[in-house]
């Protein structure tokens, strides 16, 4: 867990490992289409603009999904990286009320990939589901 207010900084190794694990578990073609696209996507949350965890998460999801840095599995990789960012920063994502969180998350990510959600809308979805770990 980070000290103070700093959030975990994702690495290229984190991204490659997450991608390879998702391909191994669920299938698809392994490989990186563009290292620069992956580095750009995982670096975007750390620009000075994204200070809160849900803001970092929204930038990460939008970039990993939109940049298509991997041959296959970009949405799955983005979700794994989001959970890694949250966990290592001392946060977790939780469902709201009676929400089926897995289904809500799937619909959310598919909506991002389809271009149906802006970055502020992504942030608005994450904000109430972002909880600091005890």
What is the meaning of each model-derived region?
Residues 1-134:
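FIC/Doc superfamily catalytic core
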């Amino acid at each position: 867990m980070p000290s103070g207010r700093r959030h975990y900084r994702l690495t290229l190794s984190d991204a490659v490992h997450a991608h390879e694990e998702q391909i191994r578990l669920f299938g698809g073609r392994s490989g990186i289409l563009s290292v620069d696209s992956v580095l750009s996507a995982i670096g975007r949350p750390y620009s000075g603009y994204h200070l809160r965890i849900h803001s970092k998460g929204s930038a990460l999801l939008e970039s990993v999904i939109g940049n298509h840095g991997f041959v296959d599995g970009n949405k799955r990789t983005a979700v794994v990286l989001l959970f890694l960012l949250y966990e290592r920063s001392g946060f977790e994502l939780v469902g709201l009320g009676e929400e089926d969180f897995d289904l809500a998350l799937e619909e959310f990510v598919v909506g991002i990939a389809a271009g149906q959600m802006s970055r502020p809308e992504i942030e608005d979805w994450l904000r109430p589901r972002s909880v600091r770990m005890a």
